């Protein structure tokens, strides 16, 4: 084999190493239990992927700008708890706010998304105008949000918030059945969210600005892009995606606590990187994000399905994250 062919083979391995590793893991799962490959599991994987996809779409926009958001999971938890207290059934004897009537679902969506937008606004302002690095800024808001959420959670009883209205349960847990396959409503919401993000990234000036900022902030500024304003906007949009995802997650699970959303941001970031969204900025596709989320969910679901110890699952997921980021760094180093 010539040196050129060896280099090509090495480049191919480097570009696709993470997929080879994940395929090996999937092969091990199937070998351990061939019943993993069935329509019921496929339906469950799609449903579990859906909320994670909505969250990952928010995170992906930030990664494209060379940013990140460690507060994403805590924002999901805050939205879940707030929406849960607003959407309990009127017949629920443990209803948090018994004096309130049944609040329409669209009103709750608007309320939690507004809260998410405000949190995103704070993150964006701190990062864009105070020049605090995204890692530090969002780590701070992560802690603050968890504190506020825990105070609120304790104030409304400090126990899992459940007993949702029938309308909300149907909204979050409903599905269309086709034979033994169930297409959940949540999957449809995620598909709509993905379509909206695709349009935003590919068909709007704002999307082009976001990619320009990620590719080279200084060049974007020279070309007339208001970098600070666009950064604030992308963090606000991300906050709204987290909020909607948190509301859906509460409904999907059937309850909410202040710890819901823990580590969701790491899963989202890892899924984005596996799907080709670069930490170096300026690179990413919606299809890639979808692929990354589904791959990660298949691995999570599969490891649980074959009974792998949850602690080993943390070790495996952490290793995948390190490998994905390392490969991304190697790709970027070569381009530099």
UniProtKB/Swiss-Prot annotation:
Record keywords: Cell inner membrane, Cell membrane, Membrane, Sugar transport, Transmembrane, Transmembrane helix, Transport
One function term, GO molecular function aspect: transmembrane transporter activity
Topology of this chain in the membrane: Multi-pass membrane protein
GO CC, any one term: plasma membrane
UniProt xrefs under InterPro entries: ABC_transp_permease
Subcellular location: Cell inner membrane
Keyword Cytoplasm applies: no
CDD domains, sorted: TM_PBP1_transp_AraH_like (cd06579)
Residue spans crossing the bilayer: 17-37, 53-73, 107-127, 128-148, 181-201, 231-251, 257-277, 306-326
Any matching Pfam family: BPD_transp_2
Homology family: Belongs to the binding-protein-dependent transport system permease family. AraH/RbsC subfamily.
PANTHER family: ABC TRANSPORTER PERMEASE PROTEIN YPHD-RELATED-RELATED (PTHR32196), GALACTOSE_METHYL GALACTOSIDE IMPORT PERMEASE PROTEIN MGLC (PTHR32196:SF18)
Subunit structure: The complex is composed of one ATP-binding protein (MglA), two transmembrane proteins (MglC) and a solute-binding protein (MglB).
Function: Part of the ABC transporter complex MglABC involved in galactose/methyl galactoside import. Probably responsible for the translocation of the substrate across the membrane.
Protein name: Galactose/methyl galactoside import permease protein MglC
Originating species: Haemophilus influenzae (strain ATCC 51907 / DSM 11121 / KW20 / Rd)
């Amino acid at each position: 084999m010539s040196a050129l062919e060896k280099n090509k083979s090495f480049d191919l391995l480097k570009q696709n190493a993470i997929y080879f590793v994940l395929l090996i893991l999937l092969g091990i799962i199937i070998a351990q239990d061939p019943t993993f490959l069935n329509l019921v599991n496929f339906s469950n994987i799609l449903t579990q992927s859906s909320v994670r996809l909505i969250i990952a779409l928010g995170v992906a926009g930030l990664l494209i700008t060379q940013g990140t958001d460690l507060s994403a999971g805590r924002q999901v938890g805050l939205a879940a708890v707030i929406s849960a207290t607003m959407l309990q059934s009127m017949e629920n004897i443990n209803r948090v706010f018994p004096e309130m009537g049944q609040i329409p679902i669209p009103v709750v969506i608007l309320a939690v998304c507004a809260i998410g937008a405000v949190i995103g606004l704070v993150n964006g302002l701190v990062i864009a105008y105070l020049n605090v690095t995204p890692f530090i800024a969002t780590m701070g808001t992560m802690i603050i949000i968890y504190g506020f959420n825990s105070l609120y959670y304790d104030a409304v009883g400090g126990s899992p918030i459940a007993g949702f209205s029938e309308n909300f349960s149907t909204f979050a847990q409903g599905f269309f059945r086709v034979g033994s396959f169930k297409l959940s409503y949540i999957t449809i919401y995620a598909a709509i969210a993905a379509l909206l993000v695709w349009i935003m990234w590919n068909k709007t000036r704002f999307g082009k600005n976001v990619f320009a900022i990620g590719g080279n902030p200084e060049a974007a500024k020279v070309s007339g892009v208001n970098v600070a304003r666009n950064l604030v906007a992308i963090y606000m949009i991300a906050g709204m995606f987290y909020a909607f995802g948190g509301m859906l997650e509460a409904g999907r699970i059937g309850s909410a606590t202040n710890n819901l959303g823990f580590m969701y941001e790491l899963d989202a970031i890892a899924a984005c990187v596996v799907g080709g969204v670069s930490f170096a900025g300026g690179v990413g596709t919606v299809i890639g994000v979808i692929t990354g989320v589904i791959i990660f969910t298949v691995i999570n679901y599969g490891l649980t399905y074959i009974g792998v110890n949850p602690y080993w699952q943390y070790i495996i997921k952490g290793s995948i994250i390190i490998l994905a980021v390392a490969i991304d760094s190697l790709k970027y180093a070569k381009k530099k």
